[in-house]
Amino acid sequence: MRCLGIDYGTKRVGLAHGDEIGVATPLPALIDADPTVRWTKLGEAIKARRITDLVLGYPYNMDGSVGFKAKEVDAFAAKLKAAFGLPVHLVDETLTSSEAESSIAKKDRRGVRDSGLVDSRAACLILQDYLDQKFPPPAPNLE
């Protein structure tokens, strides 16, 4: 299973790659404003890495209810499935952007936000959560 983690946004789309051993690695974010260019680059990333599954962050609120961007993400998920013919797995993205941003030194955050680094780190967290659920580590032998 080769996965592409996606943190969807209207300005930037964060990406991460998951390999066969269950490790997520951030990729450069798609920051081009032109949607056609973004779709082309997304298709190139899927083809280059021979992706078999797409893992998309889904906006839930802290109380577990669906977030206000859910309809937009639902439409994006449907478009992904139609365009690439791959399964799309939705994963709770609650607090991933905050966690990704907090992993960057405070003095560097301002310039980094527009670069897409936070978005790709968030995609990495989303994907790693999926991979950890799909392939849990073996239980320790307590004998």
What kind of feature is each model-predicted range?
Residues 1-6, 10-143:
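Phosphate- and other anionic-substrate recognition elements at nucleic-acid/protein interfaces
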